[in-house]
């Protein structure tokens, strides 16, 4: 690992703006799930590159954290820390990554920075998944809340040809994407592209099935891309309660937030004077089902 560089805030005082000079060197600037092409002057070094990252992603960066710039090395087939004294001389791909892992996740949710992921709530799973009817009910409540608050929703279906479509109880009105998949994780190229179109996304609220497979793999992949993940415990389940329990324990240890549907919805409105509070209050007046799910988190 390269030596620690100055914090982003220390370099934010000036420098290159969003518009690079014509005739510059093309560079692909990557951060989290995003990738944006731009150009920089020939010979641009570390400080100029940081300024360019700031111009592209400044509203998504914690300005007090330290980051490292990495270069994609063709000979290794992966990113490596930017060599000391590096200067841009040809087309290349760079990414900005945190130099140190955050040990504490605050878990603040706001509607403009949040996306809901509903994972594989399909008909063929109904007889196999524990408390499936309960998680459908809670999942539908979450989707109603998303519509009220204008939060984008992405839904996937695992091999729908064999496992059927999303259950009829789930209302797909206003959903941004419904995608078939064979991969267990929801992080498909189409999902990454959809996230890139939504400015300022920091958090994903994740629910569905199965906790220890598709939910777990989706959560870990999102966290690896710098997205904060909230798993809704009363809206996710597995065929085996043991698999579910140990998956949630493992995910919580990695800094993923295990929460409930009511906690999510009330955190998103945050204030009784919020213009949508009454509608959200009506949603949660009837408590979520008291199933065996929450006794086995």
Curated annotation (Swiss-Prot):
N6-succinyllysine PTM positions read 278
* Coiled coil spans: none
A Pfam family for this UniProt protein? Isochorismatase
Q: Which residues carry this modification: Phosphotyrosine?
A: 159
One GO cellular component assignment for this chain's record is: peroxisome
Q: Which UniProt keywords apply?
A: Phosphoprotein
What family does the entry list?
Answer: Belongs to the isochorismatase family.
The name of this protein is Isochorismatase domain-containing protein 1
Q: What is the originating organism of this protein?
A: Mus musculus (Mouse)
Q: What's the encoding gene here?
A: Isoc1
């Amino acid at each position: 690992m390269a030596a620690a560089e100055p914090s982003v805030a220390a370099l934010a005082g000036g420098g290159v703006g969003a518009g690079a000079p014509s005739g510059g060197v093309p560079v692909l600037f990557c951060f989290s799930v995003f990738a944006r092409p731009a150009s920089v002057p020939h010979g641009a070094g570390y400080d100029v590159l940081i300024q360019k990252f700031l111009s592209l992603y400044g509203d998504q960066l914690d300005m007090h954290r330290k980051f490292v710039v990495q270069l994609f090395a063709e000979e290794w087939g992966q990113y490596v820390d930017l060599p000391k004294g590096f200067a841009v001389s040809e087309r290349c791909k760079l990414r900005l990554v945190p130099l140190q892992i955050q040990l504490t996740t605050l878990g603040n949710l706001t509607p403009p920075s949040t996306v809901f992921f509903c994972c594989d709530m399909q008909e063929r799973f109904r007889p196999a998944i524990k408390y499936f009817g309960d998680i459908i009910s809670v999942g539908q409540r979450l989707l109603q809340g998303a519509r009220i608050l204008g939060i984008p929703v992405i839904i996937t279906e695992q091999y729908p040809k064999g496992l059927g479509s999303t259950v009829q109880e789930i209302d797909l009105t206003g959903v941004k994407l419904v995608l078939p998949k064979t991969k267990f994780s929801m992080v498909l190229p189409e999902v990454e592209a959809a996230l890139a179109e939504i400015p300022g996304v920091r958090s994903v609220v994740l629910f569905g099935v199965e906790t220890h497979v598709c939910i777990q793999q989706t959560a870990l992949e999102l966290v690896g891309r710098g997205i904060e993940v909230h798993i809704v415990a009363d809206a996710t389940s597995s065929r085996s309660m043991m698999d579910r329990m140990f998956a949630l324990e493992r995910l919580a240890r990695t800094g993923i937030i295990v929460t409930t549907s009511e906690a999510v919805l009330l955190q998103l409105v945050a204030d009784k004077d919020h213009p949508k509070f009454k509608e959200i209050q009506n949603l949660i007046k009837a408590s979520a089902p008291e199933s065996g799910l929450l006794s086995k988190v």
